[in-house]
From Swiss-Prot:
Biased composition (Basic and acidic residues): 331-351
Superkingdom of the organism of origin: Eukaryota
Chain intervals with Polar residues compositional bias: 352-371
Protein name as catalogued: Protein TRM32
Region entry Disordered, spans: 295-379
TM annotation in the entry: none
InterPro entries recorded: DUF4378 (IPR025486), TRM32-like (IPR044257)
Signal peptide limits: none
Pfam families per the UniProt record, alphabetical: DUF4378
Length: 552
């Protein structure tokens, strides 16, 4: 297919449709697209460095005509040449330059002021004025940008000194060369120098800030060290003062009771490493009972020496306490003296009685008593608890007829020996068999008053101990000595309300004692609460089972 299609006018058969040309030519004739042009692209030769652009002949033809090209070049040059009125306008001055020129003319008119300015330059330099903040920056409408050279040659007017001009001279660096200021815009070198100077200024400011921060941190650290040193010195001084006061108090009687006791303990430890026993408070149970219990036993020479040492230590403690109390009040001192005399007498009496008993005893009983003495010596440094006091109480109670009767009843019934006491019960409300009452009357040699009452109290105590055993958290049922202690405690408590002292009491007092003061009285609802919890558990369990059966 050719680049140029033939028009219908150029064809020989004009006005007729030529069927021999083909269907594509017919479509192009219909669209009236007679000139079909191709896009001219540059052709790259050998290397990408050298490019030659090949144009079609039709595009190169108009540029080959020299006349047309010359006329075009002349028109372009004519457009670039400035005209005379335009050059005159460019030579005109800006508004800023005009204002400066007018100010200068006004200064020249006033000859006196001009002469003073020329003569007194040194005085003006010696009294510099502080510039306003906006004066260091260029005005928004200025014709040229601010440079370092401009800042070095700024002129400022001081209206208070009759229009005197203040000249500012900034010291320049040796590296910067003095260049004349041209009225036209600055070059690229000036911009670079100005930026370099600003950067150097910021660096210097940064260094100054870093140095100030370092100095500040150093001063803070020094202050902290000083404060710590001062605090340490204060603590050392205070401790030294306390030590001095303590040393003074040790020499005199100004020490507290705790310090006195510790000081005396140290002395006693230095003498002999034996435990020290102090006098107990009068409100608590005294150790007289323990002393009588110990005096019943034979003692060796070692035990006698221990007693003498304990008595000496007690005397020293009594003397120290006496000196403190005598300073407080003479009445207390007199009471303490009387009390000490009584204690000394009681101790002497116990010692005499013990010596007499030791002489009366036979030599065969000595080894057994020595064993008991050794046991008591081991108990003394450890301190005696409630169990030891209870043992002594029971030894005293062996002589009591009531206690012996209760013990015999429990032995004969079998509650002391067997653990399973439920098998021995006569009935639910009465655990003891009533026939035991007559058997004990036959066996007993000594007569006891109110045997039936004691028998009923033992029955009641057995029932209470059985009910007192916890249901929800069950424990082992007591037997033996423990069971005897529980039963006798309940019987003794009930007997204490039947003495001669309680005969004058009213019925309300007796009922209140039974209801409120008794540990297992009517107000103790532990058993009932446990039964209720068990019943609630059963009900909840039954409801849950019913729901599960209904669902499935």
């Amino acid at each position: 297919m050719g680049k140029h299609l033939k028009n219908e006018s150029s064809s020989p058969n004009h006005g007729k449709y030529n069927h021999k040309l083909g269907w594509l030519a017919g479509m192009l004739h219909v669209l009236d697209f007679h000139h079909w042009r191709t896009k001219n692209r540059p052709i790259c030769w050998k290397t990408p460095r050298t490019h030659s652009l090949m144009r079609e002949t039709e595009e190169q033809e108009p540029f080959l005509d020299s006349k047309i090209n010359d006329s075009k070049m002349l028109s372009v040059v004519a457009d670039n040449k400035p005209t005379r009125p335009e050059t005159k306008l460019k030579k005109t001055m800006t508004t800023k330059q005009v204002t400066e020129y007018v100010d200068f003319l006004e200064i020249l008119r006033k000859e006196d002021v001009f002469v003073k300015i020329m003569k007194d330059q040194v005085q003006i330099k010696s009294n510099p004025r502080v510039l306003p903040k906006s004066g260091s920056f260029p005005i928004s409408g200025s014709s040229r940008p601010a440079r370092i050279q401009h800042k070095q040659k700024e002129n400022w007017y001081a209206p208070k000194q009759n229009g005197a001009v203040l000249t500012l001279k900034v010291p320049r660096d040796t590296s910067q060369e003095c260049k004349p200021i041209s009225p036209s815009h600055g070059s690229a070198d000036d911009d670079h120098g100005f930026n370099h100077a600003i950067i150097n200024g910021f660096r210097e400011i940064k260094k100054l800030l870093k140095n100030t921060l370092k100095d500040r941190n150093r001063t803070k650290k020094k202050k902290k060290k000083k404060v710590l040193d001062v605090a340490k010195d204060d603590y050392v001084g205070r401790y030294s003062q306390l030590l001095k006061q303590i040393s003074r108090r040790e020499g005199g009687d100004l020490r507290s009771k705790s310090l006195k006791l510790s000081y005396e303990e140290k002395k006693s430890d230095s003498r002999d490493n034996k435990p020290q026993f102090f006098r107990r408070i009068s409100s608590l149970s005294s150790l007289e009972v323990l002393g009588s219990f110990l005096t019943d036993l034979p003692r060796d020479s070692s035990t006698s020496n221990q007693e003498t040492r304990i008595s000496e230590d007690q005397d020293t403690n009594f003397g120290a306490k006496k000196s403190v109390l005598s300073s407080e009040s003479p009445v207390r001192a007199e009471k303490e003296e009387k009390y000490e005399v009584q204690e000394e007498r009681s101790q002497e009496n116990h010692l005499d009685s013990s010596n007499q008993r030791i002489l009366q005893q036979e030599p065969d009983s000595v080894p057994s008593t020595n064993k008991t003495a050794e046991k008591t010596e081991t108990l003394l440094p450890q301190g005696l608890g409630l169990s030891s006091l209870e043992i002594y109480k029971h030894e005293e109670e062996d002589e009591d007829a009531y206690f012996c009767y209760v013990k015999k009843v429990l032995k004969v019934s079998g509650f002391l020996e067997n653990k399973d006491n439920e098998e021995k019960w006569y009935s639910e409300e009465q655990p003891l068999n009533p026939s035991l009452l007559y058997e004990l009357d036959i066996q007993e040699e000594e007569t006891v008053n109110d045997k039936e009452l004691l028998f009923d109290l033992v029955n009641e105590a057995i029932v209470e101990t059985q009910n007192h055993s916890q249901i929800y958290f069950p424990k082992t049922f007591p037997y033996g000595k423990r069971y005897l202690d529980e039963v006798w405690g309940r019987v003794e408590w009930s007997l204490s309300g039947l003495g001669a002292e309680n005969r004058d009491r009213s019925l309300d007092d007796i009922v209140g004692r039974d209801l409120l003061t008794k540990s297992d009285g009517w107000m103790n609802l532990q058993g009932e609460s446990e039964w209720l919890t068990l019943e609630l558990e059963d009900l909840i369990f039954d409801d849950v089972l019913d729901e599960l059966l209904c669902v499935y």
